[in-house]
Swiss-Prot record:
Entry similarity comment: Belongs to the universal ribosomal protein uS8 family.
Name the record gives this protein: Small ribosomal subunit protein uS8
Molecular function GO labels: rRNA binding; structural constituent of ribosome
Swiss-Prot/TrEMBL GO biological process terms: translation
Keyword Lyase annotated: no
GO annotations of cellular component type: ribonucleoprotein complex; ribosome
Species, as recorded: Picrophilus torridus (strain ATCC 700027 / DSM 9790 / JCM 10055 / NBRC 100828 / KAW 2/3)
The protein's role, per its UniProt record: One of the primary rRNA binding proteins, it binds directly to 16S rRNA central domain where it helps coordinate assembly of the platform of the 30S subunit.
Keywords: Ribonucleoprotein, Ribosomal protein, RNA-binding, rRNA-binding
Subunit structure: Part of the 30S ribosomal subunit.
Length: 129
């Protein structure tokens, strides 16, 4: 069985949010996870995050907001064209214009809303609403 750090991060955030914690420590830190947290911060799903430097890898301290109802990792990491994003939006999000799908594109990690504006597709990573 392979280890999935992104799944660990998303589940840690979801569980901490459900029990009402205001802050959570996530490790190990990586560039990809930092960019995903930045997208979540841009859409106000988390208040802030910072890197805690340690000897091996470091960790993130994430300050949670009360706006997360559910979040999860999309597996397998499906490749989607810009024209097909709407299909996955209806599959993973409860309503149109409610929540975001995070995907990785040739322009970096972004939400499905930004990818649609740029007219590009990518690989689905996670959803948050």
């Amino acid at each position: 069985m392979n280890h999935d750090p992104l799944n660990d991060v998303i589940n840690t955030i979801k569980n901490a949010s459900r029990i009402g914690k205001s802050e959570v420590i996530i490790g190990p830190a990586s560039v990809m996870i930092g960019r995903i947290l930045k997208v979540m911060q841009d859409y106000n799903y988390i208040k802030s995050f910072e890197v805690i430097e340690e000897e091996r890898g470091g960790k993130f301290r994430v300050e949670l907001s009360d706006t997360i109802n559910n979040c999860g990792v999309i597996k397998p990491r499906l490749s989607v064209k810009n024209s097909n994003i709407e299909r996955y939006e209806s599959r993973y999000l409860p309503a149109q214009d409610f929540g975001i799908i995070i995907l990785t594109t040739t322009k970096g990690i972004m939400s499905h809303i930004e990818a649609r504006k740029l007219g590009i597709g990518g690989k689905l990573l996670a959803y948050v609403y």
